[in-house]
Amino acid sequence: TKIADLRSQTVDQLSDXLXKL
């Protein structure tokens, strides 16, 4: 579903940012 995709994208983006810290 679109909502699931949006959640996946958000989680991926957050993981990237945290990772970079």
Swiss-Prot record:
UniProt keywords, alphabetically: Ribonucleoprotein, Ribosomal protein
Name the GO cellular-component terms.
ribonucleoprotein complex; ribosome
Q: Which family does it belong to?
A: Belongs to the universal ribosomal protein uL29 family.
Question: What protein name applies here?
Answer: Large ribosomal subunit protein uL29
Source organism per UniProt: Brevundimonas diminuta (Pseudomonas diminuta)
| Annotated gene | rpmC
